[in-house]
């Protein structure tokens, strides 16, 4: 759904949407629990869009969201530009097609960037990883506990005593471990991963392990619960910036890796991956600029994990326009659909959503729908399995960069 009105708080917006039927461009939509999208005012729409809700009345960047299945809340972590870019988080409650928020809480009193978060379903904790720019840009993580509409935090813990940038985070639900993958600027930007163990309100880490001995950017992660493997997707700068993925196996507080596999033989300036538990496939979405294109078209590819190896189907273009690095994918487990939210550079950089269906090693798509008729960046998605809604967080450039839902 798009943000309604000229509320400056809509720049890093969270939205809920419902999808089915024909979707005209520029119309507000809602994302249904069945993974489809419908335009407001059409007869195919079964629910109306609720009113927008601002969660941060300031420039909001690096938003990352996750669903807390214990409290049935969505947690958004972000950098608050109105408060010295402090690391901040807020709890959202979905009701129908509306979302409301508690009071934002600071988890890091310093400039915080490259934020990612996940939910530890074993101990019912939210884990946020980030770059602490006020502490030499060290890689840092903190544990959050949701209570009602509030969230509290333990003490931040450094997991990498060097500057880190692009990163991904996921929860290994087989071994109840958190895995963080990142670019280690203290080691030539090598792709590195580390295993974290949550205990109470703290987190401890094993030793970091290099998975790519080259500059590694645009890192994302997901957990394949069918094979009990961690999948990391990234841009391999050392190999012509190709889109690459690798399979990780957690054992205790360590992680080991198979061989790297290329999924896109072209410049790949962003990745987001999710696990489709219906087909037992990983879906990687990304912008790419193969030699035949002049822009970074939106792509998706289906991946199959076998042991410590990963193979791919044929990449599919879901948006024939520049999607920059603003692609975010999540899996709707009710409808068994992959939902992708992205920046559509071919349509004034409007926030746009599209629904994909995996079949074998292929993925097919319906029609895209605009959820924000303004430039939208820092997009993040999460599936609320309690309300069966997809929540989209984004920065609404056309509305003062405020965080909104």
Q: What are these model-derived regions, one by one?
A:
Residues 44-405:
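Extracellular, repeat-based ectodomains that mediate carbohydrate processing or recognition
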């Amino acid at each position: 759904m798009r943000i309604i009105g000229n509320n400056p708080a809509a720049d890093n917006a969270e939205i809920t949407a419902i999808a089915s039927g024909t979707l005209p461009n520029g119309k507000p939509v809602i994302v249904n629990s069945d993974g489809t999208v419908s335009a407001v005012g059409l007869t195919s729409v079964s629910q109306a869009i609720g009113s927008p809700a601002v969660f941060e009345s300031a420039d909001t960047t690096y938003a990352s969201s996750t669903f807390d299945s214990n409290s049935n809340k969505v947690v958004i972590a972000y950098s608050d530009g109105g408060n010295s870019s402090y690391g901040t988080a807020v709890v959202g409650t979905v009701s129908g097609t509306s979302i409301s928020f508690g009071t934002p809480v600071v988890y890091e009193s310093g400039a915080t960037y490259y934020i990612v978060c996940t939910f530890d379903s074993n101990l019912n904790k939210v884990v946020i990883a980030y770059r602490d720019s006020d502490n030499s840009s060290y890689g840092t993580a903190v544990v959050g506990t949701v209570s009602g509409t509030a969230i509290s935090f333990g003490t931040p813990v450094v997991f990498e005593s060097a500057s880190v940038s692009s990163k991904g985070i996921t929860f290994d639900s087989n071994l109840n471990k958190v895995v963080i993958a990142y670019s280690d600027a203290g080691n030539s930007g090598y792709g590195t991963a580390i295993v974290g163990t949550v205990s109470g309100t703290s987190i401890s880490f094993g030793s970091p392990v290099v998975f790519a001995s080259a500059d590694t950017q645009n890192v994302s992660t997901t957990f394949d619960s069918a094979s009990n493997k961690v999948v990391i997707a990234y841009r391999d700068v050392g190999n012509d910036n190709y889109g690459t993925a690798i399979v990780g196996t957690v054992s205790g507080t360590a992680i080991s890796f198979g061989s790297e596999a290329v999924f896109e033989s072209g410049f790949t300036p962003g990745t987001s991956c999710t696990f489709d538990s219906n087909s037992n496939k990983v879906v990687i979405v990304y912008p790419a600029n193969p030699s035949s294109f002049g822009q970074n078209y939106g792509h998706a590819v289906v991946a199959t994990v076998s042991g410590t190896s990963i193979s791919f189907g044929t990449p599919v273009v879901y948006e024939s326009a520049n999607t920059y690095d603003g692609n975010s994918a999540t899996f709707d487990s009710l409808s068994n659909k992959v939902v992708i939210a992205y920046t559509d550079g071919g349509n004034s950089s409007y926030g746009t959503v599209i629904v994909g269906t995996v079949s074998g090693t292929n993925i097919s798509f319906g029609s895209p729908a605009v959820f924000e008729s303004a430039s939208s960046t820092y997009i993040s998605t999460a599936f609320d399995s309690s309300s069966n809604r997809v929540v989209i967080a984004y920065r609404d450039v056309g509305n003062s960069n405020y965080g909104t839902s």
